Every structure is written in structure tokens, then in C-alpha cells.
Amino acid sequence: MAATAFLVLTYLLGAFPFGLVVALVGRGIDPRLAGSRNTGATNVSRLCGTKLGVLTLVLDLAKGLVPVLCARAMTDSPVFLSMVAVAAVVGHMYSVFLYGKGGKGVATTIGVFLGGAPIPALLSVAVCVAVIRVSGYVSAGSLTLAVALPILCAWLGPVFLVPAAAIIGGLVIHKHRDNIARLRSGQEKSWRKDRAKAA
């Protein structure tokens, strides 16, 4: 009973649309109606500025980190910790508060694995940032992170999180299917161009 309640609370925390609230309160902009129409940190940053984008990133990351740390303090059950990890990300991606819609889950995924597998998480973030800097595309870095996480968990541990990392990575890739299509067609937006316009 307690485990079920915790999973529901984890989903609800993951589902809370911090990006929407930050954009509406900070700039009066609904990110669902502009830019990529996504409530995540990248779109909020493009629409509302870097500071509000970073705030959204931190809050979305916390949605994954806090439940996993709390779960680890409660139990060492690999199955339960894996379920908490997936619940947080699924909540962010398919929010009950947004009628089943949501973000792409990258920040929340990072938070989840910082709490459950910090070394693979940090290495995945490093690879993600490197790909973004080289390619100029945030989506390319996000996709790389989604692929790297289960591989690094399998290599460096904890191995019990590999299935959760694979499920979450697959969901992140699925959420980026439009970005993948734009990358293939050469129509994806580059953060370098966004910075040049802002300058």
C-alpha cells in the first residue's frame, strides 16, 4: 500500500508542469502554444530567456532526483527503485495535468539517474554536452544521452537499473521522433542560431 502510494506521488510530482508555470508567471507565455510547443527547459529558454530556462531545468531535474533519493532512503529494493525511476519520467512525459501530454523527459531522466546511478548519469551528461557543442543541436545531445545511459549502467553499474534505463531511454527517443525527422531533413533548430538571433 505504501509503495503504491509512493509511486502515485512520484508520478504526480513528475507530472507537475513546472515549465508551464515558470513561463506563464515569468513572461506570460504559454510554451504549449509557441516554439516547439513543449513545456521543457529548451523551449522555455528559447521563449522566455536563459534564466527561466535554467530554472525550469533545475525544477524538472528535481522531479526525478528527489523521489529516487527518498526511495533509496526507504528501501534497497531494485524493483521498487526501478519503478520509481520510470514513474517520475513517465509523469513528466505524460502528465495528467496536461491531458496526457508533457515534456521530453531529458532533465527528469538526468535527475533520476543522478539519484540512482550518479557516475553513469554524469558521464552521460558530459557526452550529451559534448555532442551539443559539436553538432549545435540540443536534440542530438539528448538522443545520445538516452542511448548512453543504459550502456553506462551496464558497464559501471548499478546493473539492476539497466532495464529502467533502457525503458526510459526508449521513451526519450520516442518523444524526440519529430526532432529526429527534422535532423534528417536538415530543418532542426540549432542553439547556435538561437544565440546569434538573441545577440
UniProtKB/Swiss-Prot annotation:
Molecular function via GO: acyl-phosphate glycerol-3-phosphate acyltransferase activity
InterPro entries: G3P_acylTferase_PlsY (IPR003811)
Subcellular location(s) per record: Cell inner membrane
Catalytic activity: an acyl phosphate + sn-glycerol 3-phosphate = a 1-acyl-sn-glycero-3-phosphate + phosphate
EC number: 2.3.1.275
GO cellular component: plasma membrane
Gene Ontology BP annotations: phospholipid biosynthetic process
Segments passing through the bilayer: 5-25, 51-71, 79-99, 112-132, 153-173
Domain of life, source organism: Bacteria
Membrane topology annotation: Multi-pass membrane protein
Enzyme class: transferase
Keywords linked to the UniProt accession: Cell inner membrane, Cell membrane, Lipid biosynthesis, Lipid metabolism, Membrane, Phospholipid biosynthesis, Phospholipid metabolism, Transferase, Transmembrane, Transmembrane helix
Biological or metabolic pathway of the protein: Lipid metabolism; phospholipid metabolism
Self-association state and partner proteins as the record states: Probably interacts with PlsX.
Summary of the function given for this chain in its UniProt record: Catalyzes the transfer of an acyl group from acyl-phosphate (acyl-PO(4)) to glycerol-3-phosphate (G3P) to form lysophosphatidic acid (LPA). This enzyme utilizes acyl-phosphate as fatty acyl donor, but not acyl-CoA or acyl-ACP.
Similarity annotation: Belongs to the PlsY family.
PANTHER family, sorted: GLYCEROL-3-PHOSPHATE ACYLTRANSFERASE-RELATED, INNER MEMBRANE PROTEIN YGIH
Protein name (database record): Glycerol-3-phosphate acyltransferase
